[in-house]
């Protein structure tokens, strides 16, 4: 099974939904008490929103890229933004 890295916190509500859907799908496919292999980083969206509102898109992108690299370094095989 691949390990999924989630860049969460774009809204914590959507991150929660992704977490639930991924785990339900793994359980449906594999049965029993299986669950997804996940690594999640949850942004404080206020920080990201402040960068966006200030037009600092490069800084926002750099922040997301650093977190993505951290998740990859921790073993994530794939990444998604939630």
Residue ranges and their predicted role:
Residues 1-63:
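N-terminal glycine-rich anion-binding loop in soluble enzyme alpha/beta folds
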Residues 59-82:
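N-terminal glycine-rich phosphate/adenylate-binding segment common to multiple enzyme folds
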């Amino acid at each position: 099974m691949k390990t999924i890295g989630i860049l969460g916190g774009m809204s914590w509500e959507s991150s929660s939904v992704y977490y639930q859907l991924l785990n339900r799908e793994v359980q449906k496919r594999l049965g029993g008490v299986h669950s997804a292999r996940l690594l999640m980083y949850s942004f404080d969206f206020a920080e990201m929103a402040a960068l966006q509102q200030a037009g600092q898109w490069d800084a926002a992108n750099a922040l997301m890229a650093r977190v993505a690299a951290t998740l990859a370094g921790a073993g994530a095989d794939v990444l998604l933004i939630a």
